[in-house]
Amino acid sequence: GSTVESYQEKAAGMDQAIIKKVMDEAKQYNGEVMRSSVQLTDPFKVKRLDGEMVHYNRILNIDGSSIMGYLKIPCISINLPIYHGTSGTVLEHGIGHLAASSFPIGGKDTHAVLTGHTGLSSAKIFTDLTEMKKGDFFFIHVLDKKLAYRVDQITVVEPQDTKELQIMEGKDHVTLVTCTPYGVNDKRLLVRGVRTAYHAKEEEIRARNHHSQWM
């Protein structure tokens, strides 16, 4: 099975008490992120202190695989694991989580930043992020939590411009980040979602097929 399937199986078999403990650690981390004024940097150029990373890498890492959950974007057929950190190896296989941002577990005063490559020959990852529109949904599964986000803002910024990635008081945001334009990659495409109620049926919608729209 896929990486996502093995994560699903592992999470499904976990004891509720352990899930609660793991989630509490992540919430605590998110509280620290909110209170700290760490300047976020371009996710494609992250350098963190090793000591902090050890602590960070242990949180939400249920089977030592460094996968914290998975991201589904039905309208562009994405279903990919979310890994700790944004190292080169991580970004070749899936979605990276920017360590200085909130863990993607939802809650007020959180803003998780998830990063993926565009134009990798080996995998599509975030190549189709440019197809997303305001009002589209994406979903994050972490252990037994299912979170839904509705795209409310799409911006293109310079790599060092991270103000759109900051936490907004009282809000629950996730921003998906990739390099743009295709082949040049000198800007960052930011697709931000705001938390909304989760409905399983929205996760089942089929991908938009651009080619057959008019047939």
Regions found by a protein language model. Give the residues of each.
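Solvent-exposed, non-transmembrane regions of membrane-associated and secreted proteins
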Residues: G1-K133, F137-M215
